[in-house]
Amino acid sequence: MSQDTGLFSIKRPRESLAHFSALPQPSSALKRTSSIGAFGNPPTAQHTRMSLLNSASRPQQPNFQRSSSGGAFGADAGLSSVRRSVSSNIFHGASAGRQSYAPGSFSSNPASQNLQRRSSVFSRPSAGVGGAMGHQSFFTQVPNAAGVPRDPRPLRDRSFQARIGQELLEYLTHNNFELEMKHTLGQNTLRSPTQKDFNYIFQWLYHRIDPGYRFQKSMDAEVPPILKQLRYPYEKGITKSQIAAVGGQNWPTFLGMLHWLMQLAQMMDRFIMGEYDEACAEAGVDVSGDRIIFRFLTGAYHDWLQGGEDEDDETAGQRLVPHIEMMAQEFERGNEKYVQEVQALEAENRALRDQIEEMEKSAPDMAKLDKHFRILEDDKRKFEDYNQNVQGKIEKYENRIKFLEDELQKTEADLQAAEDERAGLQSSVDRQGITIQDIDRMNTERDRLQKILDDTMGRLEETHSRVMEKEKEASEKLEALEEVVKAYNTLGYQTSLIPSSAVNAKGQDYELSLNVNESNFSASQIGSAPSRISPEGDRLLAEPFTGYHPAHLLSLDLRGTVRSSLQTLRKDINERRKRAADDDLDRRNLLDNIKEAMDEKRSEVEALEHRRRAAEEEFERTKEITTTQKLASDAQIEKMEKELAKMRATMSESVQLMEQREMNTNIEYEQLTLRANALREELHTNVESMLNDVIRFKVHVQKGLEDYEGFVVDEVEQELGGDMVPADDIPPEEEL
C-alpha cells in the first residue's frame, strides 16, 4: 500500500512515453469511432467507465492519432486518456452459454462478445457515425502525379506471369494460407482464378500487412482505398468494375498487384525479424531502441487490456512493472557496447593527452621558435631581394661583356691593320733609301713628339681622374635620384595617386620615371681612340658628348603641374582630417557621456545588489520557516497515509460486500426481467383479445346501421310513392 499509485497510472498522461519511438503506428492503431459515438461522449480522462449493460454497441475505442517519427506515443497521442468503458462480466463463467439481456447486444457468441468487450489495439472497429478515420494506415498519403502511370513490368508475358504466380503460390503455401482462410488453392488458381479466390488472397495478404484490419464492405469498395493508402504506384489503372471481375484480360493486372502486396509483406516480415537493422546502423539510424519501446508498449497494452473494469490504478500499475523492468534490462544490454566503446575512447583519449603532455614538455620553447622563424623569414625575404638584384646585374654584365668582346675584336683588327701599315712603311723606307742622319733626325723628332705625347697623356690622366670623380659623384646623385623617384612612386601608391585609375589621381598620371639612356657608347661612336671613361658613365649621357638637361631627365613637371596637384590634395586631406578630428571629438564626448551613464547604472546595480542580498537573507529566513512547516506537514501526511491505509483495508471489505450485493441485485434484475417479459406477453394477449372484441362490436354496429338504413329507405320509398330520397338529405336523427 505504500507504493506510489501514480507510477505509470492508466488515468493520467504518460509524459514518460513521449518521443521514444520512430516506428510508424499500424493502421489498426488509428482507431475510428464506432456507432456509439453518436450517443455518448468520447472516452477521456473526465469521463467515467460505462458498463456493458448501458452501452448501445461495443465499447468505444481510443482514438490514436497518426504521428510522425519521434512522437509516436506522446501525451497527445490519445494513449494517456484511454478509459476502459467495459465492466468485468461476473456471470461469464456461470452463464457463458446464453445471451445477455443487455440492450443493444449484437452477438450471440460469448467469445465474440468478450473480444468486442475488450478490443485490442490490433483490431479495427466498424465504421459508424464517428468513422471519419476509416481505412487509416501507417502509410502516409502523398499527392500523386497527374495521369495514369504505366506499369513497366511485362505482366502480359506468359513466362513472367508463371514466375510471379509460382512465387505467390509458394508464399501462400509456406505461410498456411489454406489453414487460416479455410480455402483450398490449386495449381491453376493463379492462372484462371475465381472472384472468391482473389478476395481470399487479397484479404490474407493485407492481413499480413495490417493484422487488425476487418473487411466490412464489398471488395470493389475496400480495395481502392487500401491501394491508395499503401501507395501502390498503379492504383489509378484499377477500376471498381475490374475488381468486380478479376478474371480474363484483367487478371495480369491483379496478379501484379497481388505480387506487389506479397513483396511488401515479405519486406515487413524481414523488418520485424531485424534483417534491415545492420543497413540502418550503417546509415546512422539506430532502431534497437525503437524495437525495445515498441515491444514494451505492445506487451504492456496487452496486459492492461486483460484487466477488469473494477481494477484500480495501483493494480494496473503493478501489471506494467515487469514490462518496465524488462525494458530497462534490454536498454542496459543494448547500452553495454556503447559503454565499452566509451571506455575504450576514454582510455585512448587519456593516452593521447599523456602523449600531448610529454610532447609539450620535450618540445622547445615556442616563443624562441617563432622568433627564429621570423628571423629566417626576414633573411629569406632579403636573400630573395638580393637574388633579384644580382640577377639584374648579371644580365647587365653579360651585355657589357658581349660589348667588350666586340670592341676587343675591333681593336685586334685595328692592331693588325697598324702592323700591316708599319710593314708597308718599312718597306717604303727601304725602297726610298733613307740615310742614317735622316733616321737620327726622325728619332730625335720622335722623342720630342713622344715627350709631348707623355705630357699630353699626363694631363689626360689628370683630366680622366677628375672626370671619374665627377662621374662617380653624378652616379651617386643619379642613384639617390632613383631612390627618391622610387620613394615618390611608393608614396603615390600609398596615397592613391598612382596609377591614373586611383581615387585621388582623377584620371592624371602621377607616376614618375627617369628618362635615362640604357645604351653604352663605344669608341667608334665617340669618334676617337678607346676612352678610359667607365661604362657606368654611359647612362649619364644623353648623347656621346652631351649629358641630360634637368628638365628632360624626369618624366613629369614636378614644380608645375605635380606640385599644384599635390598642394590641392594636401588641402583636401587637411580638410578631411579636420572633419575626422571633429567627429572623433564628438565621439569622445559621446563616450564620456556613456561612461557617466554607466557609472550611474553601476551605482544603481550596486544598490540593487544590496537589495538582492537583503532579499536573499529574507529568503533564507523564509526558507527555514518553510522547512519547519514542511517537516510538520510531512509528519501529518505520514499520519494521514497510515489512516488511509487502514481506510483502504476497511474499504476492501466493503467492496467485497458491495460486489456480493451487486451479484444479488443482478440476479434479481434478471428475474424481474423474466417476470416483466412474461407480464408483457400476458398484457399483449389481453390487449389482443380486447382489440378482437372491439372489432367484432364495431362490425356488429356497422351491420345494424346498414340494416336500419335499408329499412329507412324502404319506408321512405313506400311513403313517397317509390321516389328515392338522397342519403345526404336524411336528417341526422334518421341517419343514426
From Swiss-Prot:
<keyword id="KW-0131">Cell cycle</keyword>
<dbReference type="GO" id="GO:1990758">
    <property type="term" value="P:mitotic sister chromatid biorientation"/>
</dbReference>
<protein>
    <recommendedName>
        <fullName>Probable kinetochore protein ndc80</fullName>
    </recommendedName>
</protein>
<dbReference type="GO" id="GO:0005634">
    <property type="term" value="C:nucleus"/>
</dbReference>
<feature type="coiled-coil region">
    <location>
        <begin position="586"/>
        <end position="688"/>
    </location>
</feature>
<dbReference type="GO" id="GO:0051301">
    <property type="term" value="P:cell division"/>
</dbReference>
<dbReference type="GO" id="GO:0008017">
    <property type="term" value="F:microtubule binding"/>
</dbReference>
<comment type="subunit">
    <text>Component of the NDC80 complex, which consists of ndc80, nuf2, spc24 and spc25.</text>
</comment>
<feature type="compositionally biased region" description="Polar residues">
    <location>
        <begin position="53"/>
        <end position="66"/>
    </location>
</feature>
<comment type="function">
    <text>Acts as a component of the essential kinetochore-associated NDC80 complex, which is required for chromosome segregation and spindle checkpoint activity.</text>
</comment>
<feature type="region of interest" description="Disordered">
    <location>
        <begin position="28"/>
        <end position="47"/>
    </location>
</feature>
<keyword id="KW-0158">Chromosome</keyword>
<dbReference type="Pfam" id="PF03801">
    <property type="entry name" value="Ndc80_HEC"/>
</dbReference>
<keyword id="KW-0995">Kinetochore</keyword>
<dbReference type="InterPro" id="IPR005550">
    <property type="entry name" value="Kinetochore_Ndc80"/>
</dbReference>
<keyword id="KW-0175">Coiled coil</keyword>
<dbReference type="Pfam" id="PF24487">
    <property type="entry name" value="NDC80_loop"/>
</dbReference>
<dbReference type="GO" id="GO:0031262">
    <property type="term" value="C:Ndc80 complex"/>
</dbReference>
<comment type="similarity">
    <text>Belongs to the NDC80/HEC1 family.</text>
</comment>
<feature type="region of interest" description="Disordered">
    <location>
        <begin position="98"/>
        <end position="128"/>
    </location>
</feature>
<keyword id="KW-0132">Cell division</keyword>
<keyword id="KW-0137">Centromere</keyword>
<feature type="coiled-coil region">
    <location>
        <begin position="325"/>
        <end position="492"/>
    </location>
</feature>
<keyword id="KW-0539">Nucleus</keyword>
<dbReference type="InterPro" id="IPR038273">
    <property type="entry name" value="Ndc80_sf"/>
</dbReference>
<feature type="region of interest" description="Disordered">
    <location>
        <begin position="53"/>
        <end position="72"/>
    </location>
</feature>
<feature type="compositionally biased region" description="Polar residues">
    <location>
        <begin position="105"/>
        <end position="123"/>
    </location>
</feature>
<dbReference type="InterPro" id="IPR055260">
    <property type="entry name" value="Ndc80_CH"/>
</dbReference>
<keyword id="KW-0498">Mitosis</keyword>
